[in-house]
Curated annotation (Swiss-Prot):
Gene Ontology CC terms, in alphabetical order: chloroplast envelope; membrane
Organism: Oryza sativa subsp. japonica
The name this protein goes by in its record: Probable sodium/metabolite cotransporter BASS2, chloroplastic
Family per record: Belongs to the bile acid:sodium symporter (BASS) (TC 2.A.28) family.
Compartments where found: Membrane; Plastid, Chloroplast envelope
Gene Ontology molecular function, alphabetical: symporter activity
InterPro entries named in the record: BilAc:Na_symport/Acr3, Bilac:Na_transpt, Na+/solute_symporter_sf
Top-rank taxon: Eukaryota
Induction (UniProt): By ethylene, gibberellin and submergence.
Ranges that cross the membrane: 106-126, 137-157, 170-190, 194-214, 225-245, 259-279, 291-311, 323-343, 384-404
Function description: May function as sodium-coupled metabolite transporter across the chloroplast envelope.
Gene of this entry: BASS2
Keywords assigned: Chloroplast, Membrane, Plastid, Symport, Transit peptide, Transmembrane, Transmembrane helix, Transport
Amino acid sequence: MAASTTCPARSMASVSRALRPRPHAAIASAAVRTAARLGGGLGIVCSMPSYGRKEKEEWGLTIASAPATTAAPALRSCQLLCKAEANISSNLPESIPSEANQYEKIVELLTTLFPVWVILGTIIGIYKPSMVTWLETDLFTVGLGFLMLSMGLTLTFEDFRRCMRNPWTVGVGFLAQYLIKPMLGFAIAMTLKLSAPLATGLILVSCCPGGQASNVATYISKGNVALSVLMTTCSTIGAIVMTPLLTKLLAGQLVPVDAAGLAISTFQVVLLPTIVGVLAHEYFPKFTERIISITPLIGVLLTTLLCASPIGQVSEVLKAQGGQLIIPVALLHVAAFALGYWLSKVSSFGESTSRTISIECGMQSSALGFLLAQKHFTNPLVAVPSAVSVVCMALGGSALAVFWRNRGLPANDKDDFKE
């Protein structure tokens, strides 16, 4: 198998599987679990076929004999990842089906084009809403739960241990997600004097956990992908308490907020599927590998629908008040990106970590916000900011990631991540 020069998801998969038998494998395995989930909210998981123990041990010995610097910064440099794959490519089993490689290329192409699918979904949602509005609350809940399950399938107990080894770095990201972002949502809603339903919707979406699209944007921007995974995981788990609590505190004065109902729904849709996925990966790894192999394309389609459906369901409102609604939501995301980056620099983090925290702060699970708004608020306008946020988040995050990618990283960039 020739080494790739475009560093596709299979490159990360090759590196991760080669490193996994070695003591310092966690960082590479985090990369494959994230980069293979490329795309929007996404729960999209690519996987390499399972190989025998002998081949894995041979790969591990191959990497162990290579210079330590080959793998250490792998998460932050596509070039080094590609180089690492070149180093181990001669040791890969020749029996890898070409169809599997082609499948992974197709999945990567589809997932990295996520912003394009969001734009198409937005157009369809506005002008042909009947094509996507069939995905109503119950089906929407199942779809979002499936994506959270697929994210859980890529996590292990070791990921949570790494959170404990990086309390300050992960903690700053958590602070940005659940302090800066909600306060921004509240301040913008009050400053622009939004109506009570729209203000509540803006506050609700600002209190949602990080979205998996942030992992993709971090990868593109040359940020710390492993750190992005950890912060998304932590904010997802914390959502069961933080999302209903902050929404109640900040929006309770505007409309009645059922904090208990929000907590229960968040647990059912976000936390429970994630826990099931983690346990399945930990105790039934072979079974999990088989599931992961068939989820990518399903995830691409499902994620596009979960982005298009909210737009379709509020299309009439968007046609009538589109400009008025876009401004506060876009301002929320832009300010969150900027303040997340500033907070990281104030905390003396390196450029890679600062980009990661900025993206994590600016991109959240808008689909969860839309679902909670539909289930727990009687006024349909509460769901509108979350629908608009789907588009603003995807386009804004992608644009920022491409901008940073073209700027590169300082040669002496500080590494704030501890294995």
